[in-house]
Structures are given as C-alpha cells and as structure tokens.
C-alpha cells in the first residue's frame, strides 16, 4: 500500500488551505457517487470509510484491459472505431466513469482533511452553498468599491494543455495516459469544454468527467488570484519558481519574453496587487473582480490576466472578454440580475433659531433588478407566451389532468418567485406571474374546449388565486409580525440560502 501512497498523497500544507475546497463546491454538487460506478467499491472497509488505493489501482488495470480490447477492435476495423457501433457509447461511459472516480479521490481527501481541520468554521459556512449568498455579500461590500472587472473565463483550445495541467495534481501517469487516449479518440472532443455546447453527446452522457475537467480548468485559472494574494502557490512547491516552471513548460517560444518580464517585475506586481479591498466572485464561466482602487489598477489587472491566459494556457484571449465598469455609472449583469449602486437622496431639515436649512445627504444603495426581457424570451421559447409577452396555452400539457397542469404552472411560478425574491423592484415579478397564471388558464380552457372567461366564470378565479399566493403565506410565517404583507408580497429584497443553481428559465447563457 505504501508504494501507491505517493499517487494521491497530499501536501500537508494543503490541509490548512480552506479556499480550494470552496472553489470545488460547484464540482462537489455535480458528482453523483451512486451513478455508474458505486462508491462502495472504493472502500476498503465500508464501516471505517477508508479509501483502498489497491482497489483503485485494480480499477486502472481493469480499464487498461478494456482499452486493449478497444485497440484490438480498432485495428480489425478502421471504419468502425469499436468494431461494434452499439458498444461505442458503453465503452466510453465505462472509461469516463472509471477515470472520474479515480481523479476525484485526491480532491475528496483534500476536502475531508479541510473539513476536519475547520470543523467549527464549516458549520458557519453551510449557507455558502447557496448562490444567493453572493448578493448579501454584494450589498455589504460593493457600496464601498469603485470599479469592477467582469470576466468571461476562457476555455482551453487544446486538450493536451488540460491533460498536462492535470498531471500536477494527479501523479498517476497511467490514468493520465488513459485520459489522453480517451479524449483524443472521442469524436466530439472539440466541444468538450465549450460552455455554449452543454447539449453535446459527451456532456450529456459523461457529466461526471465533464464537470470534473471543466471545474479543474476553472480552479487552475483561479490559482493566479490565490498566488498573488498569498504570495505563494497552491502547488507542491510553494516557491514562485514552480509557477514559472509551469509557465515555461506551457508557454510557446514567443511568450517567453513576456514571462521573463513578469518574473523581473514580480515584486512590483505584488505591490500593485496588494489591495485589501479586492473581492473576487465566480459562478460557472463568469467571474467578477471588484476593487476600491483606481481605473489604472483595474487596467493593470486586465493586462496581467490576458498575459497570464496566453502564457499559462497557451491561448489567445480577446480583450473583450474582460470589461471594466464603474459601479456608480454601470449596471452589473450577473446571475440573471442587473445589479447597480445608486444614490438615494435623504433630505433633512435643520432649524436654528430664526433660520432653517435643508441638508441633502446622498446615501448609496445596492439595487438588484430582474432581467425581464431575457426572462420573457425564455418563457416564449418554452411556449408559455409569444415574443411580445402575451400568454398562450401550453398545448403539450393539454393531455394532463387539471391538477397536474395547475401543479406544473404553480411549481414554475413559485420557483421563479423564489429565485427572484431578492429583486428590489417586484413589478417584473408580477408580470411573470401574470403570464404564467393566464397561460395556465388558457391551457385549461383549451383542454375543456372553452374560453378563458367562461372557464374562470364556471370554476371561479379563487382556485388559481389561492394557489399562486402560496409565497405570501410562506412569507407570513418567516417574517416578523411588524411586516405587513396584506397588501401584497413583501417589497424588500429577500435572499434565500437554499438555492444552489439558477432556474432553467432564468438561465439564458
């Protein structure tokens, strides 16, 4: 067992780094251990829950035996990759699931060690699982910041770069060779990491491996922030030379001049980027870097990020993937919300003997607004309304029971209201509710071959009214009694800490 320990042995310094398990938070939700290969086969003793490295090595050997069969079939019939087309997807699925299980182990052990060392702090960090926890953070921090960088994370243009960066985390050469063979032989590998092509065959049938590779790539991209903030790398060697060695290894010859310049001015770079008011947030392929500094500092960040992508990932990054916005003048489009910092005037009258004064105090307020046009477009695409937002019947659901139709519409309405509850302006939510409510009525009327007016007159509108006001009933239980909700939904922003992903209709990416 000791000879295999080095393959997934973690540096002890990692155990004190609590940041990286949080980076892989989204990746943890994506893994389904009970799908495909059972997690129990990786346990040496299920009672003690210890990973058996010997069993892991046997899995690698077993997959290599399967790999030999694939190669034999390939040589026997060049036109048919596996010899039998109906077995093609099955073999790919087995290899991808097996490899995903193997490469997950080091990161799982890293997470477990971090959770054990930070057990008391983890209890307070459960709410970080919710993506809504980002917006209270914005409300608290963005009022004191000036500029924000909106970054679209680039995806790797060549899979060899992805495999080579992975080798610094996973030291098992055999499994990496297997991954390289699997990726290069797969017919649809060009759309592996592209965010806009989630519907590809690979991402549908190999979600476990797809999520791991994409989140690993994002983690590698985020390593530059951790390195510059801590002045040390997350690699096994904490010296800056380790990062430079990797840049030299990946960078093409024409980029080495820039890398040397980066090395020469490294101390100056650390001084420039040592900003105590720098904040970083990411969700999927979009990230935000906000700072209290000047526009010059943000332009330097943009310059060094572009050079880092070009040198480290050997790709050309378009400057348009990074936008610099001033918070006081521009809205931030993030996670299906328009967020901005606006000034509210507070006029105070001051009376002094015979004279009175009016004092105007500007107060900053963080404002979040629903992106109504893309949301209506998503509803139109789902056949709930037309492109102008006029409700239409959902013809595909007319064969369902009345209770099922109402339940489906009600669930969508509640989920959207639940997600957009943090909006500062509720008028857009009322419009979405109106579209779904009338679409439900039109669907029921079409099913019963009647008009909407006659249908509602016969059954009454209360059956829909009571159903769609369930959100108000929930709010009456969780809000203090001094909040009056008899006039309608609570108008202030309300963030829920149980939302881990964007609703499909709200996600227009």
From Swiss-Prot:
Keyword match Plastid: yes
Primary location class: plastid
An example Gene Ontology biological process: RNA splicing
Gene Ontology molecular functions: RNA binding
Gene Ontology CC annotations of this record: chloroplast
Protein localization: Plastid, Chloroplast
Domain of life from the UniProt record: Eukaryota
Keywords: Chloroplast, mRNA processing, Plastid, RNA-binding, tRNA processing
Function: Usually encoded in the trnK tRNA gene intron. Probably assists in splicing its own and other chloroplast group II introns.
Family, similarity comment: Belongs to the intron maturase 2 family. MatK subfamily.
This protein's name: Maturase K
Organism: Opuntia quimilo (Cactus)
